[in-house]
């Protein structure tokens, strides 16, 4: 199996794992809060990944520039979480998810302009199909929000932009030092520090609820999200951003399927949903054939 093919497989597994993290979090959020699951997930990420780093021989030599750039990535990742949660609160989860789905287009643009990657026509077509499919599946009619403001749309778009920037930065750093495990752990530490600062700066608006019934779902969330972070960084170390990013972004499809199976959420499968799933599948096939 070529490195590009392996990267695609890891990106696909990443999308399934991240969808599992979202579904598991949704189960726990019946008894707790988004702030709690975010902190729980970041703590597990640090515990698991730093344990793996030291179990595999400790920290290897990495350039300072790489450490600094992945520190920026960790800050961006925290920004993605906060913007995504706030966007879901302000304009609804489905609209927020649909707008965030443009992130592969941002990643591809930066990868082509700065990293010099050259996507084939099939990869470009596949990326557009994946984004269009995610929008079709994610966007659902929701009630009008009295407090809605047009600038609220910038929240999920900001999350998409930060996500799109993260992938090329990761790819660049991994060409300097191919240490995906260490950089994944470093990103978790930066996210934890940033999140604790955020909690200290806004204690009244952020509520931590430690509920027993939420414990195991949040353990699942932390485990799935940690594995998804490690695998996406490993995938980017092996393959081009223009190939990996759109495949990893197809997680809303898997979240829809898993929610029906594990949460018994019987969302209607209408023509729009079928077209969206077909578009994502066709897009992934096109990306694979165009590699």
What are these regions (language model features)?
Residues 1-75, 81-91, 132, 139-157, ...:
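Membrane-interface interhelical linkers
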Residues 17, 76, 102-103, 162, ...:
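MFS transmembrane alpha-helix packing/gate-lining sites
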Residues 41-45, 103, 129, 187-191, ...:
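Transmembrane alpha-helical core residues of multi-pass small-molecule transporters
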Residues 104-125, 135-137, 253-274:
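C-terminal transmembrane-helix exit sites in multi-pass transporters
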């Amino acid at each position: 199996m070529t490195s590009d093919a392996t990267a695609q497989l890891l990106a696909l597994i990443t999308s399934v794992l991240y969808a599992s993290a979202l579904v598991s979090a949704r189960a726990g959020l019946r008894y707790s809060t988004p702030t709690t699951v975010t902190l729980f997930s970041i703590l597990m990420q640090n515990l698991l990944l730093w344990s793996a780093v030291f179990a595999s021989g400790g920290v290897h030599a990495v350039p300072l520039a790489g450490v600094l750039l992945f520190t920026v990535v960790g800050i961006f990742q925290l920004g993605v979480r906060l913007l995504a949660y706030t966007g879901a609160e302000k304009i609804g989860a489905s609209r927020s998810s649909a707008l965030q789905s443009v992130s592969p287009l941002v990643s591809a643009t930066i990868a082509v302009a700065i990293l010099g990657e050259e996507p084939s026509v099939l990869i470009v077509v596949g990326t557009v199909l994946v984004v269009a499919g995610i929008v079709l599946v994610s966007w659902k009619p929701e009630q009008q929000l009295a407090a809605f403001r047009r600038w609220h749309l910038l929240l999920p778009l900001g999350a998409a932009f930060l996500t799109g920037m993260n992938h090329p930065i990761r790819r660049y750093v991994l060409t300097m030092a191919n240490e995906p495990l260490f950089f994944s752990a470093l990103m978790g530490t930066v996210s934890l520090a940033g999140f604790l600062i955020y909690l200290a700066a806004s204690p009244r608006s952020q509520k931590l609820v430690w509920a027993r019934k939420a414990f195991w779902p949040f353990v699942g969330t932390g485990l799935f999200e940690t594995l998804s972070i490690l695998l996406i960084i490993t995938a980017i170390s092996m393959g081009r951003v223009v190939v990996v990013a759109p495949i990893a972004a197809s997680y809303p499809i898997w979240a829809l399927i898993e929610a029906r199976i594990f949460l018994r959420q019987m969302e209607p499968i209408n023509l729009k949903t079928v077209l969206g799933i077909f578009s994502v599948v066709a897009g992934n096939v096109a990306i694979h054939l165009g590699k």
